Every structure is written in structure tokens, then in C-alpha cells.
Amino acid sequence: MAKKGLLGRKIGMTQVFADNGVAVPVTVVQAGPCVVVQKKTVEKDGYEAVQIGFGDVREKLLNKPKRGHLKNAGVRLVRVLREIKVDSMDEYKVGQELKADVFSAGEYVDVVGTSKGKGFAGGIKRHNFKRGPMKHGSKYHRRPGSAGAKGPARIFKGRKMPGRMGNERVTVQKLQVVRVDAERNLLLIKGAVPGPKRGLLLIKSSIKAK
């Protein structure tokens, strides 16, 4: 499968019916339109990639470096910039517009987003710890318990403990594109994708698809 990608926003979830009548849960994603801002080359940058931009923005909301970068490229002002790896750099030109129809129904994609923030969470919610007895004199209900032995007299790095949960980069792999609405730049992707409604997403070709 050719490597390609798009930026988009999560609209919400719904369901569609397959040809055999089975209801399929899908996430509706506004994918694009994106614009090619820059082509990274091995000679100049040490690697090959295509930089794409997404989302309209007023000029005064951009900082000077970003504003100058976009003006030098001769493209419209965009809110978000991301890089994607592609198979053939020759297929892309600076200023070219990428729409939802770069993907087709039946393809598999990886979706990258930022998960919903849950705030400060305990061990049971955050790490699926087992709780203690709720009765028979127990005072150990939802506490984390021992965090380490007496010997080292310290807590090792990586110890699972209560703390802030969510609001981190999450990738869900090998989700199937059920439908493509090229006119409205919509992708219907089977299953759930990370983040809240209106959350920014990067949709790219699945690395696990055969």
C-alpha cells in the first residue's frame, strides 16, 4: 500500500449499515482539505517527507516564523503543520491540495490523536489495579498499597501510581475506511478514534496493512 496521509478533525460517531444488513459503528472525520507546504529532501534535510498544513487561521494568530514560512511557500495560511512520509515525492508539489479522496473505501489506516484528559486518577482507574475488600474490617479499599520494598528505600522509575490520566498522544492502528465522501471531505472510519469531538487527527496509511 502506498504511503499517504491527511490531517483532519473528529466530528463524532454514528453507524452505517453494510450490504448484509449489519450495523457498523463508524467515526466521521473531516479529512482535509490539506495543502502541501514543503518537500523535505535528503540533500537538504537528511530525510524525505512532505509537510502538509490544515485548518484556516487569521494572520494575526500566527507567529512570525510560521507566517514567513507559509508566505515563502506561497500557500494559504494554515493553523496546523505536520510531516508525513510518502513513497514518491514526485507526486507532490508545493501548493497542491489534498482531499479526502486520497483514501478509498476498504483501505486500512492508522489514526493519531490526543486522548481525552481525565484529570488526576487513582490506580484502579488509571492502571486497572485490583481493589481491596470492602467489608470485614478492611481499611484498604482503593488505595495503591505498597510502592516498593524496604531494602532500596526508594521508589523505582516507572512505578505505576495515581496521577494525571489521558491528554497524551495515542495511535490506533489498522482501522478500516468504510466510506469516503469526496464532496464534503468526510471519511467514515470503522470503530473509535482517540480524542474529543473537534479534536485534531492525523490519518495515515496503516503500517500493518498487507
Curated annotation (Swiss-Prot):
**Which NCBIfam families does the record match to this protein?**
L3_bact
State the name under which the record lists this protein.
Large ribosomal subunit protein uL3
Q: Which GO terms describe its biological process?
A: translation
Query: What PROSITE patterns has UniProt attached to this entry?
Result: RIBOSOMAL_L3
Q: Name one GO molecular function term.
A: rRNA binding
Assembly notes: Part of the 50S ribosomal subunit. Forms a cluster with proteins L14 and L19.
* This protein's UniProt keywords: Ribonucleoprotein, Ribosomal protein, RNA-binding, rRNA-binding
- Region Disordered: start-end pairs: 132-152
Highest taxon of the lineage: Bacteria
Pfam families referenced in this protein's UniProt entry, alphabetically = Ribosomal_L3 (PF00297)
Gene Ontology CC annotation, any one: cytosolic large ribosomal subunit
Family from the record: Belongs to the universal ribosomal protein uL3 family.
Protein purpose: One of the primary rRNA binding proteins, it binds directly near the 3'-end of the 23S rRNA, where it nucleates assembly of the 50S subunit.
Bias type Basic residues, positions: 132-144
